[in-house]
Amino acid sequence: YKISDIPSGNYSAVQFGIGVPKASNAKEPKDFSASSILSSPAEYWSSWKSYIFFRPEGKIALDGSTVFDTDFALHLGSDDALTTYDISRTIQIIDGQTTNVDITIDMQKFFNSVTLHDIENTPQIHSLVQLPIMKKLVENLKTAVK
């Protein structure tokens, strides 16, 4: 993600959110200009009336083998999922130069920090009845971002 107009100087932390503020989350992609990141219908969950903020997807091997043959898709969204992160990091911004700040998500912590996610029984999150499970994964995500 590219951010412009940060004054040059030395910074000791970065603060950012994963999610969409409630007022924006209440809107649909058609309500935003084409240049907005929120204009993409691929990131909107019409049945939840919410954007998807974090979407780990892939294949896993559930039987202990090395054959990754089971799909998983854990889509996190809703007003309750918006989380702000404060990460201590020395950052120097110099006029006219690009500064990169790497943010890492430890997926092992995402699946198994506060609560162990039972991916065998819940390999997909696509329904409002799964909101309690999604909230547990959001709590795990809080410990996984660094």
Where are the language model's segments positioned?
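A short, solvent-exposed, low-complexity linear motif enriched for acidic/polar residues
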Residues: Y1-K146
